[in-house]
UniProtKB/Swiss-Prot annotation:
The lineage of its organism: Bacteria, Bacillati, Actinomycetota, Actinomycetes, Mycobacteriales. Pfam families: Methyltransf_3. It comes from Mycobacterium sp. (strain KMS). It is an enzyme of class 2 (transferase). Its EC number is 2.1.1.-. This is Putative O-methyltransferase Mkms_4069.
C-alpha cells in the first residue's frame, strides 16, 4: 500500500517530518492569514508560520524596542515581529517596492498597530541601512535577495546593540548552501554571509532548519 505521506509513496525523512510538525504546530490568526494570502496574490515571499513564531520569540527574548527588517513583503514577518516586541517598540521595515509597503501597512492597520510603531521606508536597503545609527537596534531580520546577504550582514551587525540578535532568512537555499558541488552566485553569497558571522568574535551563531534556513546570531 502506498504511503499517504507522499504522492509517490515515499515516506518523508525524519528531518522532514520534524520540520513539518514544527510548521503544523503553529496557528496564525485571521489577520496574519489574510496578509499571507495577499503575499501570494502579489507574488511576494512570506516567512512560514514556524519562522514567524521564532521571530516573535526572539523579539520577546531580546525585549526588542527597536527592530530593523530588510524585506517588508506583505507584512507577514512584520506582524510576527511586532507581536513579540515591547508595546512601545518600533519596527523599521525596508523594501524597494512601494506597493509591498502599502499592502503591509494595511496589515498593520488591521492588526490595530498604531502608526507610531512602524516606520516603513521605501528604497534600496543598501542605501537605507547605511543611514541608520550604530548599535541602536535590538534585532535585525534580513529577508532579501541572497546575493545581497554579505553586505546586509555587515550593516546589520553594525546596527546591533550588545545583547541583540541578527537573523538571516534563506540561509540554506533548499540545501544548496551545503552542497559542495554548488557554487553559483547565490550560494557563494550565502556562504560568505555565514563566514562573516562565524568569524566575528562578538557573535554566537546557529543555523536553524526552518523555512529556507535561518542563520541567527546573538551579539555579546
Amino acid at each position: 500500500m502506498a504511503s499517504t505521506d507522499d504522492p509517490a509513496g515515499q515516506r518523508p525523512s525524519r528531518a522532514e517530518a520534524i520540520v513539518a510538525h514544527a510548521e503544523q504546530s503553529i496557528s496564525e490568526d485571521a489577520i496574519v492569514a489574510a496578509a499571507r494570502e495577499r503575499a501570494v496574490d502579489m507574488g511576494a515571499g512570506a516567512v512560514t508560520p514556524a519562522v514567524g513564531a521564532l521571530l516573535s520569540v526572539l523579539a520577546r527574548l531580546t525585549e526588542a524596542k527597536a527592530v530593523v527588517e530588510v524585506g517588508t513583503g506583505a507584512g507577514v514577518s512584520g506582524l510576527w515581529l511586532l507581536s513579540g516586541m515591547r508595546e512601545d517598540g518600533v519596527l523599521t521595515t525596508i523594501d524597494v517596492e512601494p506597493e509591498h509597503q502599502r499592502i503591509a501597512k494595511q496589515a498593520f492597520t488591521e492588526a490595530g498597530i498604531g502608526p507610531g510603531r512602524t516606520r516603513l521606508i521605501s528604497g534600496r536597503a543598501q542605501d537605507v541601512l547605511t543611514r541608520l545609527a550604530d548599535e541602536s537596534y535590538d534585532l535585525v531580520f534580513i529577508d532579501a535577495d541572497p546575493v545581497d546577504q554579505p553586505q546586509f550582514v555587515v550593516e546589520g551587525v553594525r546596527l546591533l546593540r550588545s545583547g541583540g540578535a541578527i537573523v538571516v532568512h534563506r540561509a540554506a537555499l533548499g540545501g544548496r548552501a551545503g552542497d559542495a558541488g554548488a557554487n553559483d552566485a547565490e550560494v557563494s553569497a550565502v556562504r560568505e554571509a555565514a563566514r562573516l558571522i562565524a568569524e566575528d568574535e562578538r557573535l554566537t551563531p546557529v543555523l536553524i532548519p526552518l523555512g529556507d534556513g535561518l542563520l541567527a546570531a546573538a551579539r555579546d
